[in-house]
UniProtKB/Swiss-Prot annotation:
The active site is at residue 18. Belongs to the 4-hydroxybenzoyl-CoA thioesterase family. GO terms for molecular function: fatty acyl-CoA hydrolase activity. This is Acyl-CoA thioesterase YbgC. SUPFAM superfamilies: Thioesterase/thiol ester dehydrase-isomerase. It comes from Haemophilus influenzae (strain ATCC 51907 / DSM 11121 / KW20 / Rd). Keywords: Hydrolase.
Amino acid sequence: MLDNGFSFPVRVYYEDTDAGGVVYHARYLHFFERARTEYLRTLNFTQQTLLEEQQLAFVVKTLAIDYCVAAKLDDLLMVETEVSEVKGATILFEQRLMRNTLMLSKATVKVACVDLGKMKPVAFPKEVKAAFHHLK
């Protein structure tokens, strides 16, 4: 666990790779998404509960990703996730995919809170915002 973030292990499976055993570029997004979801779970929130009880969903608003070094079949990796900014309806995540101390990829992901009934951005629930502010 990072000081103000979360670490999540991922193993590279055959389904994640191309014919050469290298992780397909879109799979990195899956790894980052899983880590953000599990991070939320450690704060005692689930996307399913927010969806069912409040009709809220977290959606990716913007994403920037850098691929530095290829991940390969059977690698055991760590996704490090930190919150760098919390605003009314958005949270900015900084994420790194690591193999030991080597950074393979990094991503900056802005996630927005959306009211699914209106399909418009809304402020994060107070308890979610407070949980993330506590980490900063």
